[in-house]
Regions:
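A structural signal for short hydrophobic beta-strand segments in well-ordered beta-sheet cores
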Residues: 157-160
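Glycine-rich phosphate/cofactor-binding loops in nucleotide/flavin-utilizing enzymes
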Residues: 2-21, 89-90, 111, 352-398
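Alpha-helical transition-metal enzyme core signature, strongest for iron centers
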Residues: 132-135, 265, 269-272, 299-309, ...
């Protein structure tokens, strides 16, 4: 347990130095306060145990559906009505509480539901999206492979048409929710035209096997898996009709990269808030840590970075609402915010001294979890190359 006087460490301070909250509509403010209350009242006191045990937090995940927080801004019947700003605020607050919950939401809504919403048939949307928004059903998104992460465009999983079905063979890795999913969006290369296409593989389909990847030091309370696909037979009606090339897959990923920027912001705010509270209460040499000049300088530097991250997120939400969010812009936001979050969390952990490595003091869990956010949906290196190609006109991938 946290030492006396620090039991509330991790609860929101409402850090907003530039008064950005004043821009929120009543609906956006409701999503913010609803998610914040859930995190402060239900998540913080139990999530450290789930994380330490590497146990999936089913009760908390179910609450996401009950509270109407799963939708990622999808304008589809059955999903809670929210704009991109509201979706970002939800992701920010969940990640402030825990990276595993933020990651679950990113997979469930940002990847699996979004792929079905963007590329699925009306029947597929009606069947899956409502139950997934309520978390009555769980989804997964299988793109990354054992030998293809950053170069997933070269994926080797294949699909061939055979009568009234498709037969899929291959392997996937680092697939969130894959061991518990009711439906998995699998991306595979059509052997006939060599284009990448999307398929819905349902729970219990013969030939589908998923095994949890153990020994993780990040986002431990959600499960990623290795998938083996051996002659997995998928009926024709389970192919996503709008997913006919890797570009269609990429359209889904644009939105998730902006979500990663919000996730990183949540982690950074958690670190800054904890460091500020701790610096005010912790006494050394007869006075609070915050009375030392060097500590104040570090806190102000952290606040400046958090505020810049907030401004990034506000702008990408505005662009997304207007239908103008470019892949390069989302990539730059992810690159910037994940990089800054890592720096802020390292500072926060250091300011907490020895207590900074204890789970009850919150920061070390966020410091570990930001490593996953920094890596998935396109590493910093890949985002740099994407933006670099855009501003110079020269590709430097190889």
């Amino acid at each position: 347990m946290a030492a006396a006087g620090y039991d509330d460490l991790g609860k929101a301070l409402g850090t907003d130095y530039f008064f950005l909250r004043e821009q929120l509509s009543p609906e956006q403010l409701d999503y913010l306060t609803r998610t914040r209350r859930f995190v402060d009242d239900e998540v913080l006191q139990v999530i450290g145990g789930y994380w330490e045990r590497a146990e999936f937090p089913w009760p908390l995940v179910k609450r996401l559906g009950e509270l109407g927080l799963v939708g990622d801004g999808l304008d589809i019947d059955g999903c809670p009505p929210m704009d991109p700003f509201s979706a970002g605020l939800i992701q920010m607050e969940l990640s402030r509480g825990d990276g595993s919950l933020g990651t679950f939401l990113g997979v469930q809504a940002g990847l699996a539901m979004r792929a079905i919403a963007m590329h699925g048939s009306e029947e597929q949307k009606q069947r899956w999206l409502g139950p997934m928004a309520r978390v009555d059903k769980v989804g997964a998104f299988a793109l990354t492979e054992p030998e293809h992460g950053s170069d997933s465009i070269a994926l080797e999983t294949n699909a061939r048409r055979e009568g009234d079905s498709w037969v899929i063979n291959g392997a996937k890795r680092w697939i969130g929710n894959a061991t518990i999913a009711d439906v998995v969006v699998v991306w595979a290369r059509d052997l006939e035209d060599r284009e990448v296409k999307g398929f819905l593989v349902e729970k219990g389909t013969p030939g589908y096997q998923a095994q949890v990847i153990e020994g993780k030091g990040s986002v431990r309370a959600v499960w990623q898996a290795q998938i083996e696909l051996e002659d997995v037979r998928v009926p024709l009606e389970n192919r996503l009709p709008g997913a006919n090339s890797f570009k269609d897959c990429g359209r889904v990923l644009v939105e998730t990269r902006s979500s990663c920027a919000w996730m990183a912001l949540g982690h950074a705010v958690a670190g800054y808030d904890a460091a500020l509270v701790y610096a005010k209460r912790r006494r050394q040499f007869g006075k609070p840590l915050c009375s030392f000049q060097i500590v104040q300088e570090r806190l102000v530097r952290m606040l400046a970075e958090v505020t810049a991250m907030q401004l990034y997120c506000v702008q990408i939400a505005r662009l997304a609402s207007e239908g103008r969010l470019l892949p390069t812009v989302a990539g730059l936001a992810k690159l910037h915010n994940t990089r800054k979050a890592r720096q802020i969390l390292a500072e926060a952990r250091d300011l907490l001294g020895g207590n900074g490595i204890l789970l009850d003091f919150q920061v070390i869990r966020h410091m570990a979890d930001i490593e996953a956010v920094h890596t998935f949906e396109g590493t910093e290196t890949i985002q740099t190359l994407i933006v670099g190609r855009d501003i110079t006109g020269v590709g430097a991938f190889a």
